[in-house]
């Protein structure tokens, strides 16, 4: 059964992303990122982007977790990720698993971080989760799911299965998890309720929805992701799960923010307009570093989406993964 389409016009987005991405990275996003890359470019100008939602046929049933794709699938991986022959080194014994956000996919979300970590010698892996059959983005000519839609608890279970695949392929005892937005929050559910604490060494969240947000905040993602406005109130169970006061968030709040033995880093931006107030992203616990991007780069205008492409934020991620070799993170 088809779902009535919602038309939307994005509000003007301030000139933030160009100063954050840099010309080379922005060009790469445009060439490789398809629709989301084009949205990032539009957000970096004073133009008011408008979009007409594509015709999307949604299934009658509520979305459920997608099956993990087999090796050699046609779903695009970001540069540097999903080399299943990669073996961790003594310098970086924990593979890094990248977890994208709501309305996103592994390819577009991690165009910047994945190749950076690969160049530093990490084994890097990235999954797509929470997808709905038939809901895809094809602006780049690749099969790009619109992910992060399914029930958050099922997506966390899907993350757990992917971690098991990575550990089996690499021989690693544990992994490090790096997530953006919803992808920064899901590891917490996996650790708290699905036995992930024994399999994870570090968790790094970029603008994570750790304690929920408002549906109004989630709608502010729509200008960046063509078709998202159609999905917020139809196929996006994760949107409702991330709302403050949801049953999912009540369960998350019923236990402490963190589990023993895992090191957490939260990287937030004062300009976050999606997960608000931004300090609600912070975690409480003795094993937590809560970091504000502008403390390292006061002039950074990176907001909720751009933080995943901010050179300063990515430097902070690298420091969190390898604190013994951390270096000062400045602008640029």
Regions found by a protein language model. Give the residues of each.
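Composition-driven, intrinsically disordered low-complexity tracts enriched in small residues
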Residues: 39-81, 86-88, 168, 211, ...
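Serine-dependent carboxylesterase/thioesterase catalytic core
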Residues: 100, 124, 147, 152-252
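Secretory targeting and sorting signals
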Residues: 1-42
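Hydrophobic/aromatic beta-strand patches that form the interior of the parallel beta-sheet core
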Residues: 97, 125, 204, 265-267, ...
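C-terminal catalytic-base region of ester-bond hydrolases, centering on the histidine
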Residues: 225, 259-332
